[in-house]
Amino acid sequence: MIKGKRSFPKRQNNVRVLNSSRVEEFDISDHNQSIDSINELSAYEVLSLRKKTEDGIKSNLNEERVASSLTSRAEDNKPCRDFVKSDRNVLASDFLSKYGEETDEMNKTKKKQKKIMKKEIRKRTKRKRKSVNKRELSGSIKTWIPTHSGSSVFSSLFRNCDDSKEMXDSIVDCLSEGEEIEEIKIVNLSDSSHGSSFESDEINEDKNMVDEEENDEELIDERSTNSAVRENFVRCYGKEKDEDASDVVIDFEQKPFSTHCDSVQNGLDAIQWLIDPYDLTQFFKMVFQKKVFLVCHNNPNYYGNLFSTAKFIDILQTDYVEYGTNVNVAIYKNQQRSTLNGSGKVYPQAIQKSIKAGCSIQLTNPQSFCDNVWYYCDLLQEVFGCFVGANIYITPANTAGFAPHWDDIDAFLLQLEGRKHWKIYAPDSDDEMLPRLPSGNFTDNDVINRMLVFDDWLEQGDMLYIPRGYIHQGFADKDVHSLHLTVSVCRNVTYADLLERVIPPALSNFAEQNVNIRKSLPARYLDMTGVLECDYPLLKTGTMKLHRFLDSIFSNFCKYIKELSEPAVDMMAREFMRTALPPVLTKEEKDMTALCVAGSSLYGDKEHIFTKNTSIKLLRRHGQRLIYESEERCFIVHRMANSRVYEGRPEVLFDLDVELAEGFANLVNAYPRWCLVSDLKCNDAADNIRLAELLYSNGLLMAEFREAMK
């Protein structure tokens, strides 16, 4: 075995391929992936050119098509074990000899037609690339209804089509006779790039055209193998926008997602905005933790003022940012990643020198310094129920800062500046899927035999989702730097983490309640069995008794564990409250919490007084959790006073009298609606007010005081 090379078991691919053959018909640059997608012909131009080409040779092919049609009908009633047919009735050339001269003639005719069309398309591609208007390239691509489906469209489907009906009619015209017409949908199972070059090369394009003419059968075989790639990758495009609306830039300082009274709904809106126009329900059902997912928003300003290089410089100038703790400086050369951190405070000029030397910069916790990133991470915490962190990566032009690796988190990559080329590889086996720990650094030899599911550019304004366990590596463009924000979710919130928290205490309690499990092991148990294969004196009789006893214990213990699902979730919730970011409050929310000042002056004598008619509401749905320590004691743990640095402060909690627990439950049930203090329905009115005051003083509650409103 070559030193440094890692061996991995091959993955058994049993995931359904979603109509991958539909992608291939209009693919005109399989061997020339270095051509930027913005220089491709639009779908409308391809379809129009195809139609004209077909019309020019249709009369010459009429007799051959009639004969082939009769032949195909006669063959329909025969078994076709080896007969391969694509969605558009293109026959695979490897099997033609089995089906007579008529079928062979038909395929040759179609090949001639296809070659003529490719030549015309390539000539037109060159003309378009020379005359392309850069101003038009910044425009948004027009889209259609967001529906997850197996139907496929290639990258420039609706670029220059101003009339959606015209485009739909063009697609219908190109469908074969008798083929079922499907609704146009948004999902594109993208083709994976084959080349490693990121620059356009017109000379290679001409060479590829000749190669394709000579090796057309090889193209078909290559595409059939690529179909397995598409099961792990989904791509969709941004919605069509009016010219006036396209100039609107999101402003995170205005808390744009804090529009609902329910904090979970606000979080869902934030995720929907990130993956727009893809459907949120379909994302969690079909994509999340299953596939790499790319959204081309086609809007360089899509992320507004979320973060920028200017903001990073401002952080370095105004905050105490330290090497190792907040910033890492790394360089990747000769398949090795080296960390070149300094010591102490990070200064802008030092970062400037590092970037000039080809080093990448990682800001490990931008949410601690940038309110906009903090705000967005907090929104997602309400949905995922875990700490949501972020990283900023600045990569100089023509460099790669980090080695190939996988993460122990699900990552949303937001390309804020420049562009970056990503290569992503699927896990080789189920053992590598959804890992709980990050990997080490891989080399090119480690990934050479892995399934490449994504090999493409992430443009400014785009979003790329990478599930846990997918090896990935990024390269900046040769002419421009890259700055992207990685939002990390779902770290340490697996079922395994839940069981790790519940099984040890559950086993202890189970032993206290079950006398049989407290019995000593039988005499001479050492002679019953062991891992070493040898003649144990009591192997037959002793092992049988031991297994029978353990089977009974395990069966009862599993039943006991199932009854602990409720406290197990509470334990996970407690961990979330301990590690999560504190909530970001709007001005209106601050004015209705303990953060506001009663009256107009800190030195005034006004005081907020709770009455039975005071309107109250929890500040967040998942800002707090009531935990029962025993039947006689409970407490509330919350994240309202947490640090913006991960685990920067100890856990914050306070005791709650058990008799007030029902009132707290009524308050939780009322969310997201407002309710009166009297609606808490504790034992008496005094307990209602006592509970409201306790929650309010700890920052969990919003209240509307009539005197203050007046």
UniProtKB/Swiss-Prot annotation:
The note on cofactor binding and number reads: Binds 1 Fe(2+) ion per subunit.
Composition bias, kind Basic residues: at what positions? 109-132
Q: Which GO terms describe its biological process?
A: negative regulation of DNA-templated transcription
Q: Which UniProt keywords apply?
A: Chromatin regulator, Dioxygenase, Iron, Metal-binding, Nucleus, Oxidoreductase, Repressor, Transcription, Transcription regulation
Q: Which InterPro entries match?
A: JmjC_dom, NO66-like, RIOX1/NO66-like_C_WH
Task: Provide the primary localization.
Answer: nucleus
Q: Which SUPFAM superfamilies match?
A: Clavaminate synthase-like (SSF51197)
EC numbers, comma separated? 1.14.11.-, 1.14.11.27
Reactions that this protein is recorded to catalyse: N(6),N(6)-dimethyl-L-lysyl(36)-[histone H3] + 2 2-oxoglutarate + 2 O2 = L-lysyl(36)-[histone H3] + 2 formaldehyde + 2 succinate + 2 CO2
Q: List the Gene Ontology MF annotations in alphabetical order.
A: 2-oxoglutarate-dependent dioxygenase activity; histone H3K36 demethylase activity; histone H3K36me/H3K36me2 demethylase activity; histone H3K4me/H3K4me2/H3K4me3 demethylase activity; iron ion binding
Location in the cell: Nucleus
User: Can you tell me which residues bind Fe cation?
Assistant: 405, 407, 472
Required co-factors: Fe(2+)
Where in this protein does the record put region Disordered?
Answer: 103-137
Provide the JmjC domain boundaries. Answer: 359-506
Q: Which GO terms describe its cellular component?
A: nucleolus; nucleus
Q: Which Pfam families match?
A: JmjC_2, RIOX1_C_WH
Homology family:
Belongs to the ROX family. NO66 subfamily.
Q: PANTHER family from the xrefs? A: MINA53 MYC INDUCED NUCLEAR ANTIGEN, RIBOSOMAL OXYGENASE 1
What does it do? Oxygenase that can act as both a histone lysine demethylase and a ribosomal histidine hydroxylase. Specifically demethylates 'Lys-4' (H3K4me) and 'Lys-36' (H3K36me) of histone H3, thereby playing a central role in histone code.
* Protein name, entry field: Bifunctional lysine-specific demethylase and histidyl-hydroxylase NO66
Q: Which organism is it from?
A: Brugia malayi
